[in-house]
Amino acid sequence: MINKNDIVADIVIDYPKAADIFRSVGIDFCCGGQVSIEAASLEKKNVDLNELLQRLNDVEQTNTPGSLNPKFLNVSSLIQYIQAAYHEPLREEFKNLTPYVTKLSKVHGPNHPYLVELKETYDTFKSGMLEHMQKEDDVDFPKLIKYEQGEVVNDINTVIDDLVSDHIATGQLLVKMSDLTSSYEPPIEACGTWRLVYQRLKALEVLTHEHVHLENHVLFKKVS
């Protein structure tokens, strides 16, 4: 049974669908997930701890036996899973979404300057993530696999620390984009492109939080 002293990130490791519940009440299970459920709920004004625990325990009871839980994968299989489930979809979404973000800034930015800042922040986020994922694929992940196979990797702790630092910077950019868009809530006068951009940026945030959580709290723990 899940209780108030359990760690947020650990709950999501054991029950991935719990991420949806934490997300719905604004609790960070990603870079800020190493806190108890009680401590996390106290930081949120409108979160009832008992109600939150009930929802989490409902997820625990309905957890489907035999469903894929990445925590049971070995390092090399987990890396393949991360690349297929997050790296490739993110690259594809960046390619498809960028023209809409650019259009939104160009058309509506003159009257809504925060949309220009949104594009600049998105561009920084995109370039950082693309560079980060490529480095993981080409350099860092092969080192983790070598470590799993028993080879000596002298800088393994530095590799992990650097990746976690990148993830923290990524999280800060996500927070900034959410703040600029009032948590991706479009204004009443928003056109179709405006609404599309907000909707897809919000989905991008969800995907990135899941991605970073899986690396920080599952993959890296297997090699540290």
From Swiss-Prot:
Highest taxon listed in the record's lineage? Bacteria
- InterPro entries the record matches: Hemerythrin-like, RIC_family, ScdA, ScdA-like_N_sf
The question of whether Metal-binding is a record keyword is answered with yes
Q: Name one GO molecular function term.
A: metal ion binding
Spell out the Pfam families in the cross-references.
Hemerythrin (PF01814), ScdA_N (PF04405)
SUPFAM superfamilies, sorted: SP0561-like
In which compartments does the protein localize? Cytoplasm
Q: Does the record's keyword annotation contain Plastid?
A: no
| Keywords in alphabetical order | Cytoplasm, Iron, Metal-binding, Stress response
* Gene Ontology terms: cellular component: cytoplasm
Q: Name one GO biological process term.
A: protein repair
Instruction: Quote the subunit structure annotation.
Output: Homodimer.
Summary of the function given for this chain in its UniProt record: Di-iron-containing protein involved in the repair of iron-sulfur clusters damaged by oxidative and nitrosative stress conditions.
Concerning its family, UniProt says: Belongs to the RIC family. ScdA subfamily.
Question: What name has this protein been given in UniProt?
Answer: Iron-sulfur cluster repair protein ScdA
- Upper classification of the organism: Bacteria, Bacillati, Bacillota, Bacilli, Bacillales
